[in-house]
């Protein structure tokens, strides 16, 4: 009883100053909602129409159930997957972790939707939603990014850290909130996707909050006690291929030929080709190499510090051990679906020929590069929290480069980022990763402090100037004569 009270009190104390903490700024790392008549807007419209057709089906019934707006309403939906009840009085430590994430998530969503003014689909088309009794209540709210997919995915990522033994089922449940928001008419598909990415950004920011790791540890202990499950929070270093989240289970199938998303993929492929001779096209080729050193180069430019094995050994080791997991976690779906890559499907050249032969017979969906870059941006965001928005923006650009070069369809890239989010979450169930992250954070803090100390030191040109009598001048001398600047005599004529 006392521990429960302490956890509740600690959670609220941690959140008392939460408004003063920065929330992820979606305007920095996400594109704006699609403009009318754009390819993505047309895709959104088709999917809205298709969603309406599903409202009388079993999937429509599920969508209606999924349209919830509070943590207490989300929890029964996850309880069906977890096999335990989560509330303030049952599995209370898990509930407090989610409650803390929910309060911060609500702030982040509020800040995000205030940046946009996109009408909800049912408002735009002047039609009733699947839940007409809620239409008036939510009609003035922006639909971008989608509330349900953001919080639903955030809860799924948090629970994947708590319950790694059932992570695939949890992630599958979390992903389903996006399509439900589309079917209900409350969100467009692009709103739902933006919500997923915001949810992953929120998780990364939560891991920088003081006391959050304690809440997570208590929640993990709660789950193990209640279920007797053998969790992954042990001393085995990181993950084997078999232990990674299974992308076949929690991702939707790649778009079928002739579908709205496939048509959108074709349009984005043509758009990508038109960008190959631009700066974006050049950068896409620079980003092709999937390696520790290339990721360090890319994110060093964002952070403004050099990241390599000599200057930052702890961060370098973190990158070298994490980045392979981003690509590895996509291989299950790649092998299962064996979707043809764009240059193979279209029988055309890419903008980077050396990799064509080696990748021709490999699956395109989802993108390993997009997964790895988003994963590394989330990891770097935990190391350097003040740079999160810029890091995620760079990762988003990295993923788009795969469309420009012709190695991936847009939907490959989109869902690759979700894979990276899932891997980032479950990494926090590994003690060695958590320890390595702590070393990397401390190393970055020391390096950042040293850099700023050097920058703040007066340079020789800024040395104080004195008269020969020892009087320090508050401004450069205007009279002729001999003065002392630093350790040198200067003659003002």
Which stretches of residues belong to each language-model region?
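Sec-dependent N-terminal signal peptides
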Residues: 4-14
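Sec/Tat signal peptide C-region and signal peptidase I cleavage site
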Residues: 15-20
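Hydrophobic alpha-helical bundle signature of multipass membrane enzymes
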Residues: 21-184, 205-215, 221-405, 418, ...
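Short acidic/histidine-rich active-site segments
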Residues: 187-194, 406-417
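Catalytic phosphate/nucleotide-handling subdomain of diverse soluble enzymes
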Residues: 200-202, 421
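Short, glycine-anchored, charge-dense loop/turn motifs used at functional sites
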Residues: 333, 468-471
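Residue-level detector of functionally pivotal "anchor" positions at catalytic/ligand-binding pockets or at interdomain
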Residues: 448-469
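C-terminal tail/sorting-segment detector
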Residues: 482-493
């Amino acid at each position: 009883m006392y521990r429960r009270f302490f956890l509740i009190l600690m959670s609220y104390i941690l959140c008392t100053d939460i408004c003063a903490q920065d929330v992820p700024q979606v305007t920095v790392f996400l594109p704006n909602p699609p403009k009318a008549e754009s390819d993505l807007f047309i895709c959104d419209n088709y999917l809205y129409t298709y969603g309406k057709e599903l409202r009388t089906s079993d999937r429509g019934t599920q969508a209606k159930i999924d349209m919830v707006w509070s943590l207490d309403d989300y929890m029964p939906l996850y309880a069906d997957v977890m096999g335990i009840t989560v509330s303030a009085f049952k599995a209370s430590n898990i509930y407090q972790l989610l409650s803390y994430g929910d309060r911060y998530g609500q702030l982040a969503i509020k800040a995000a939707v205030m940046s946009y003014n996109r009408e909800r689909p049912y408002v735009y088309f002047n039609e009733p939603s699947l839940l007409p009794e809620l239409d008036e209540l939510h009609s003035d709210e922006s639909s971008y990014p989608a509330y349900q997919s953001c919080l639903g995915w955030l809860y799924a990522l948090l629970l994947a850290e708590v319950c790694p033994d059932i992570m695939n089922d949890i992630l599958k449940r979390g992903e389903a909130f996006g399509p439900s928001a589309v079917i209900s008419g409350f969100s467009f598909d692009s709103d739902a996707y933006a919500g997923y990415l915001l949810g992953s950004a929120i998780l990364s920011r939560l891991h920088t909050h003081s006391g959050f790791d304690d809440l997570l540890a208590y929640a993990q202990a709660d789950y193990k006690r209640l279920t007797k499950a053998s969790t992954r929070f042990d001393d085995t270093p990181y993950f084997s291929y078999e232990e990674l989240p299974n992308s076949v289970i929690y991702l939707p199938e790649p778009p079928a030929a002739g579908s709205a998303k496939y048509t959108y993929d074709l349009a984005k492929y043509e758009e990508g080709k038109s960008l190959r001779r631009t700066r974006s096209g050049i950068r896409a080729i620079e980003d092709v190499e999937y390696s520790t050193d290339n990721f360090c180069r890319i994110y060093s430019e964002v952070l403004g510090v050099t990241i390599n094995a000599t200057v930052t050994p702890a961060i370098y080791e973190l990158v070298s051990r994490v980045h392979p997991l981003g690509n590895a976690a996509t291989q299950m779906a790649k092998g299962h679906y064996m979707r043809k890559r764009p240059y193979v499907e279209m029988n055309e050249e890419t903008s980077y020929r050396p990799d064509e032969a080696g990748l021709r017979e490999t699956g395109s969906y989802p993108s390993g590069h997009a997964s790895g870059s988003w994963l590394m941006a989330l990891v770097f965001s935990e190391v350097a929290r003040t740079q999160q928005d810029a890091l995620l923006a760079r990762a988003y650009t990295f993923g788009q480069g795969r469309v420009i070069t012709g190695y991936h369809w847009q939907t490959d890239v989109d869902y690759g980022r979700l894979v990276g989010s899932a891997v980032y979450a479950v990494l926090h169930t590994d003690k060695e990763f958590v320890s390595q992250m702590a070393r990397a954070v401390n190393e970055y803090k020391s390096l950042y402090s040293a850099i700023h100390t050097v920058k703040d030191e007066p340079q020789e040109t800024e040395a104080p100037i004195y008269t020969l009598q020892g009087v320090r001048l508050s401004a450069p001398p205007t009279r002729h004569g001999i003065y002392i600047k630093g350790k040198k005599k200067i003659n003002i004529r």
